[in-house]
């Protein structure tokens, strides 16, 4: 009987250790994936042609581990794009776009979005060429839904120009954000100056006559 109890206890311990090892393995995998994506975002902002080898070196992760997570450069860029879209969505949620005066809510939304764009400037440059502008807009569309609703709210209140279609205004805003990011990437403007220009341009685009 004692032998059976001991065997059962050993089995339970082995199962618990195996489960712990699997959990640690998953945690390590998630951590490595985050490090690789962080490194890719950082390096792409400096050099849009950065290689996978440079990404793995910056992340301090082996190339074997990198290829385990991302089979190609395109796979890495797609994963980074997906993460950037998720961060845009979170930024707009934190901006409380349904609260307060529409112009103030728009300022909060653009300031929050600009912080995300700053982290992914490399993607802003390469994705239109890599994916095409229509595909970039398609991927961003769900995340930008709060911004479109804010435009509609502003038009109904008289704060924004009601004569222009919300989708047109949203496209103009998106292009202006990308233009501001490109100015920073080229060195023509610093981040603060580009943000200031973005906010002034957006106010001029949206304001009712």
Regions inferred by a protein language model and the residue ranges of each:
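C-terminal peripheral helix-coil segments that are non-catalytic and often amphipathic
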Residues: 1-20, 145-157, 182-209
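Basic, helix-initiating cap at the start of DNA-binding domains
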Residues: 1-46, 50-58, 75-78
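Short hydrophobic/aromatic patch on the recognition helix
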Residues: 60-70
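Alpha-helical DNA-contacting segments of helix-turn-helix folds
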Residues: 70, 77-84
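Short secondary-structure transition hinges
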Residues: 75, 115-149
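Hydrophobic alpha-helical connector segments
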Residues: 79, 90-119, 132
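Hydrophobic/aromatic-rich alpha-helical bundle segments in the mid-to-C-terminal region
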Residues: 124-129, 137, 141, 156-201
